[in-house]
Amino acid sequence: MYRPLIAVFFFLLLVFTVILVRSPKADLIVVGVIWTGETDRPFVEAMAIKGDRIMTIGFRDEVMSFSGKNTEIIELGKELVVPGFIDTHVHFLQGGLNLASVQLRDATTPEEFANRIAEFAKSVPPGTWILGGDWDHENWGGELPHRDWIDELTKDHPVFVTRLDGHMSLANSKALALAGVGNDVEDIDGGSIVRESDGRLTGIFKDNAERLIQMHIPEPSDYEVDMGLRLAMEYVASHGVTSVHDMNAMLDGMRRARSNGQQLTRYYGVYSLSRWEMVRDMVNREGNGDEW
């Protein structure tokens, strides 16, 4: 009677040993305060990761059993680990291109505003449009910028830099000339053009009026798209954002990033309702996408 039990015991021990020996080892083990999202166990001490999958979570000693000679271990102490954030409304390419352009968000005086544009102009070839900026005129008391601030500094570059909320932009005289916009231009519905008392344009265009200049700005090249998306992905990853819903879908650029092994962000491209037939045909042809 005892011999069969002993045989079964040693058989189970052998199986358990084989399982331990053959159990996959983690590529990465993270130790810290890890939030799980589970009501009955909201926090654990560690998690093991292999490839792009979480193998297990639990107490430190439990998870460390998945450690091998090539396992990287990150000790975070009391730092908090949470799932990646999802931003459901972004303009991803525009954000990335802005990161590559002149930075005006924290300019605190008209002089600093103008000098930053001038310095950036020196770094790009003549004729290059200077865009983005994300300026905030409230930083220097509320006076709107004027094209006279930058015209002498940007004679070789058309400039159309935008306020941080996107609702107004400043054009220099070269941009106005390329767009064929003069002092006699009429206001358009849903927008306004700021003028001096004698009717001379200051260079500020608001809301729908911005289109008078925007329609003359060249589309970004594939190189610029790829650079902008890369910068955007790196930036959001540095802030814990792992998925985005892009209001201006750039699927071709993201496909290139994917094929080159450079995609860092899960991506959902959003199209306007007016393009539903194009989206339908694309889904019928290519499917709904994959996990990325």
Locate the predicted segments by residue.
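Positively charged n-region of N-terminal signal peptides that target proteins for export
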Residues: 1-4
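Hydrophobic membrane-insertion alpha-helices, especially the h-region
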Residues: 6-18
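Divalent metal-binding segments
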Residues: 23-31, 35, 39-284, 290
